[in-house]
């Protein structure tokens, strides 16, 4: 028999990376919050890669931290090795990536939820969700009913989860945890547009069964850089990673057994991630490629499990072992956990607003893989947005909408709700038109004032941020006014760096603008240089060197925001506008864009359609 068990302002279904950020944000904004999880030992679980960050993902983590989220701080607490990716490219694509202790990460996050004021962590499977006059009723498998003003669905890969390993298939969530078997039917009954996606994970092998003799060692950067602006130091890197390569023999085993892959045998219905394909998918798609790289990464300090990055598979366990044994270093490896594919239910994100609230279901929000994305960082970013907006809805305040020009989080959300996701969506720097101004080094500059305004950034942290901004301003002023004389020592340094000598005094800022020079190379002649946070030097140098490009991009942002400010009605039938093509009418009615800017990014809406909309707006002011 059902029984009434309590009520909350905000309820979060799922305690993965999205659910954690949503719950913490809502509770910190003063809302009575609950987060429900099938298994409390799986809070903040990292069922795939034992790492946080990476290309574009590192940007997201820095932005989450700048807004007042938790992922960056916890990643720093659990870090094993840190590396800055893409150092050989421009600063826009520099991305931090950290190996983490995955079990410690889960433990630390669970404890943070337990200690958070206004927040209750509950082990309970939500099996039913029903709309009420002022919110939603959630029913657990134990028949407890909770009344909630707002709900955030963050079910990850648990919703209708099914594992595939060769011919073997069974209902399960990741890491052998029970799936959410009943909630999907309730969501469909409610009217949410669900579909099936698929992802996968590589095997974990025993550290002691690996031969490291001929493997390439991949060390971390020294000193390692933290994600969080509040982390002062990480200490030293604690582990090494290793690189190996597949070969022709590996390829042959895959080709001989491809019929045993559930993906190629037609057993998996869900659409998989384009940018994180299974190893057998790589072999089939790139048959001419003689070898593929893989990374061997530790899962923690107190475990012997090693993760084989780049080797996701759904082939039978014995086939996995056979092809692993063809790889240098893995000739005698022992599988501790086999690779598997997992299929799960998720929603069409175009059913949501930019607040991540469902258009047709007020007070119901979605976040993470439930929204069709992939990755821990993408999930955490959406969880933060959904949790903030669920709380702001309860508090009767204006919602948080991040635009594409202000953050990668805004780009991620806009892509999902405007363009949708026909496959698991992965964040990449190439998805942003404004990546030169959306660098990870200036995430605090872009988002910390907003985090403070919302209420997630403390006054103490905000004052530190303002002080940093003042120091940066003073340093730029110093560089503009400091004159370097043409001495023998100065010209020797310039010649050694491959740039022309100076014959008259030159402002320091003009030397830094030269492509061959940077802050470090000018240290010996810059005698008045103050001791500042390296992050300040980094920001100053980038802004000086790329001033022209940044200025050009800021003008593009100005134009874009003019279109974003041309608001469209949210309850309008576009079939009534003459001149719009049929496809545009259908897409506009489905997406219900909030602005001309958003309408222009909808696939199937042409520039001619936008012109029609602009004329219609002018006529109907």
Model features per residue range: what roles?
Residues 3-7, 24-132, 142, 154-174, ...:
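Conserved N-terminal/central alpha/beta ligand/cofactor-binding core
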Residues 39-41, 84, 184-321, 418-491, ...:
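An anion/pyrophosphate-binding glycine-rich loop and adjacent beta-alpha core
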Residues 369-377, 433-435:
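Glycine-rich phosphate/pyrophosphate-binding beta-alpha loops
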Residues 379-400:
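Internal hydrophobic alpha-helix adjacent to the cofactor/substrate pocket in enzyme cavities
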């Amino acid at each position: 028999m059902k029984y009434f068990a309590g009520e909350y302002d905000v309820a979060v279904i799922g305690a993965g990376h999205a659910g954690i950020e949503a719950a913490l944000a809502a509770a910190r904004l003063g809302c009575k919050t609950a987060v429900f999880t099938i298994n409390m030992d799986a809070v903040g679980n990292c069922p795939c890669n034992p790492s946080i960050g990476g290309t574009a993902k590192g940007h997201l983590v820095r932005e989450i931290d700048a807004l007042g989220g938790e992922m960056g701080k916890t990643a720093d607490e659990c870090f094993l090795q840190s590396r800055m990716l893409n150092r050989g490219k421009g600063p826009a694509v520099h991305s931090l990536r950290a190996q983490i202790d995955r079990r410690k990460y889960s433990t630390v996050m669970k404890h943070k939820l337990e200690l958070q004021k206004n927040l209750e962590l509950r082990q309970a499977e939500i099996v039913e969700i029903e709309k009420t006059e002022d919110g939603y009723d959630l029913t657990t498998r134990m028949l407890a009913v909770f009344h909630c003003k707002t709900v955030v669905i963050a079910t990850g890969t648990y919703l209708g989860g099914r594992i595939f390993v060769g011919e073997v298939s069974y209902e399960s969530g990741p890491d052998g945890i029970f799936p959410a078997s009943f909630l999907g039917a309730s969501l469909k009954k409610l009217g949410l547009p669900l579909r099936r996606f698929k992802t996968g994970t590589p095997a974990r092998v025993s550290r002691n069964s690996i031969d490291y003799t001929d493997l390439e060692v991949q060390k971390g950067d020294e000193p390692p850089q933290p994600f969080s602006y509040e982390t002062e130091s990480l200490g030293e890197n604690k582990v090494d990673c290793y690189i190996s390569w597949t070969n022709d023999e590996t390829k042959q085993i895959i080709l001989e057994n491809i019929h045993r892959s559930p993906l190629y045998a037609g057993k998996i219905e869900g659409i998989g991630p384009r940018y994180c394909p299974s190893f057998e998918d790589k072999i089939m798609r790139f048959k001419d490629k003689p070898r593929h790289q893989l990374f061997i990464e530790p899962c923690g300090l107190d475990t012997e499990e090693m993760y084989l990055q780049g080797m996701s598979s759904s082939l039978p366990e014995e086939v996995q072992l056979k092809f692993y044994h063809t790889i240098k270093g893995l000739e005698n490896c022992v599988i501790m956990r086999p690779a598997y594919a997992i299929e799960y239910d998720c929603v069409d994100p175009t059913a949501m607003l930019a607040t991540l609230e469902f258009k047709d279901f007020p007070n119901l929000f979605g976040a993470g893989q439930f929204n069709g994305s992939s990755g821990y960082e993408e999930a955490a970013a959406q969880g933060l947005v959904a949790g903030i907006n669920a709380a702001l809805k309860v508090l009767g305040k204006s919602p948080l909408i991040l635009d594409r020009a202000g953050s990668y989080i805004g780009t991620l959300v806009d892509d999902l709700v405007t363009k949708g996701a026909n496959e698991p969506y992965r964040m990449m720097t190439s998805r942003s038109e404004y990546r030169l101004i959306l660098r990870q080094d200036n995430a605090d500059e872009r988002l910390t004032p907003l985090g403070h305004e919302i209420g997630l950034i403390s006054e103490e942290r905000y004052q530190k941020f303002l002080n940093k901004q003042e120091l940066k301003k003073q340093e730029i002023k110093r560089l503009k006014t400091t004159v370097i004389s043409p001495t023998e020592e100065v010209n020797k340094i310039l010649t050694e760096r491959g740039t022309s000598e100076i014959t008259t005094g030159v402002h320091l800022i003009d030397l830094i603008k030269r492509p061959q020079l940077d802050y470090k190379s000018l240290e010996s002649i810059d005698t008045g240089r103050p001791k500042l946070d390296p992050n300040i030097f980094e920001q100053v140098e980038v802004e000086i060197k790329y001033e022209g490009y940044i200025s050009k991009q800021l003008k593009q942002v100005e134009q874009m925001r003019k279109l974003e400010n041309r608001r469209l009605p949210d309850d309008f039938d576009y079939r009534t506008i003459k001149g719009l093509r049929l496809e545009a009418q259908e897409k506009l009615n489905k997406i219900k864009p909030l602005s001309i800017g958003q309408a222009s990014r909808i696939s199937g809406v042409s520039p001619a359609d936008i012109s029609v909309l602009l004329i219609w707006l002018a006529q109907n002011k």
